[in-house]
């Protein structure tokens, strides 16, 4: 007798939510629509998540785990300052491109009208990434004895703004304008400017 693999209902709900965020850009996702997509009642959704905010927190936890774990790998495996910065930005852009619905969460678009703590959590994630970029840039000064003409905090903010802007364009274009489009050429220019400073 063949047994079908047991579906992890929580993961399935989160996958459906991410899919709906991708296929319904600009629209608010209701628990009724999500329940219909998952194929269960709203009551069944609430057996797995006490609120819609907790569902979004589940997506945010996925985002944090995926991005921060890869960020740690970059820090462990790469020592060159400019390559580290490039890889951090590429990580954000590629992650967004591969997860269009989740890009709406990163961008804040999907969180409009939702619980404030969700937006705060995304803000904290971006603050961690910016802090990491600042640390990467400061280490260049320590290792090479030569820094930048601008404060590392200002440069880190600029670099993160580039990635956030590309993600915003991706969401605004309803996922047509890929965040990685022309990034290599743009990075070459940015790197030249950074190394001149």
UniProtKB/Swiss-Prot annotation:
Record GO biological process: cell division; negative regulation of division septum assembly
The keyword DNA-binding is assigned to this record: yes
Statement: the UniProt record of this protein carries the keyword DNA-binding: yes
Example GO molecular function: sequence-specific DNA binding
Residues in HTH tetR-type domain copies: 7-67
Pfam family membership, one: TetR_N
InterPro entries, per the entry: Homeodomain-like_sf, HTH-type_Tx_Regulator, HTH_TetR, NO_SlmA, SlmA-like_C
Entry GO CC: bacterial nucleoid; cytoplasm
Family as reported in the entry's similarity comment: Belongs to the nucleoid occlusion factor SlmA family.
Residues annotated to bind DNA: 30-49
Alphabetic keyword roster: Cell cycle, Cell division, Cytoplasm, DNA-binding
Entry's localization field: Cytoplasm, Nucleoid
Subunit structure as annotated in this protein's UniProt entry: Homodimer. Interacts with FtsZ.
Function: Required for nucleoid occlusion (NO) phenomenon, which prevents Z-ring formation and cell division over the nucleoid. Acts as a DNA-associated cell division inhibitor that binds simultaneously chromosomal DNA and FtsZ, and disrupts the assembly of FtsZ polymers. SlmA-DNA-binding sequences (SBS) are dispersed on non-Ter regions of the chromosome, preventing FtsZ polymerization at these regions.
Name the UniProt record assigns to this protein: Nucleoid occlusion factor SlmA
